[in-house]
């Protein structure tokens, strides 16, 4: 993996996760930067890669796809839909259209305060028009999808 990183055509745009630079902190060369490397992020990256490989990439992709489809079906049952066209959707980040007359920010606030569920608002031209629902990594589970759908149903 490091050989692939070392041979890439373009360098990292930031020192924060420049794997070549960070490799120096792990004993592969001289220390280049005078500040402390983001060690906690290195450990988080290591652990996330370990978990992904432990689960198996094919299994991980299948789990994300399955939970995306579960969310899509549950939203349909609530009369809601994803805004991105089929074929342009990400299984991990789902843009849900906010129904007319619904207080987008108010629903997000109630989801957080009453149910402990945080979702994101739309950005740019989608501000106030969509909710961004993440199903990434460990958070991509049937339990989380069902919990979100149940909470959303209670608020609409």
Residues of each region from the PLM?
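Small/polar glycine-rich anion-binding or flexible loop at a beta-alpha turn
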Residues: 68, 87-93, 124-132
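Active-site C-terminal subdomain of aminotransferase-like
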Residues: 1-73, 77
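A common structural junction motif
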Residues: 111-119, 152-156
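PLP-dependent enzyme catalytic core of the Aspartate aminotransferase-like
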Residues: 125, 129-156
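A short linear hydrophobic-aromatic micro-motif
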Residues: 79-83, 117-122
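Conserved PLP-binding catalytic core of the aspartate aminotransferase-like
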Residues: 81-114
